[in-house]
Amino acid sequence: MNKNSNTYIIIYSTVMVVVVALVLAFASLSLQGRQNANEENEMKGALLSSIGVNIVPEKGADKTQFINDQYDKYIKNGFAVKEDGSVVDGANAFDILKNLKSEYDKPASERELPVFESVDEQGVVKYIIPVRGSGLWGAIWGYVALNEDWNTI
C-alpha cells in the first residue's frame, strides 16, 4: 500500500485512535481503585486540617498510612443530621461526605448532612461540619470546626 495515499493515512489514523483509546480506557479502569482511595485520603486530610492536625508525615513515611492513623486517632465519631438537627440513625457520615453534592441537590427537609466529632490530646471536643456553596465559576467547599459550645470556630 502506498504510504502517501489518503486511504493509508485515514486507516493509520483510525487504528492509532482506537489503540490509544483502548490503552486510556484500560488505564482509567485499572486505576479507579487508587483514584477512589486518594479521594478518600484527601477528604480525611482536609477534615484533620480543619482541626489543626498536621497531615505532613516525616520524610520517607507513607502519607496515606500517616493520614489514616491520624484520622483514627482524632476523629472519634461521624453522624448525620437532618434539617431540624435530629441525628439520623444508621447513617454513615463519611459515605454522605463522598456524595455531598447530591445531598445539597435534595430539598432541605430530605437532606442528611454529615458531622464529625473529634477529640484532641487534651480532651477538647470539636465538631467538623462540611460546607458547600456556589462560587463565581463553580462550587466552593470546605470544613468548619466548632468547639463543643457550637459557637467558637
Spans of features found by a protein language model:
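Flexible, solvent-exposed loop/hinge segments and secondary-structure transition points
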Residues: 2-153
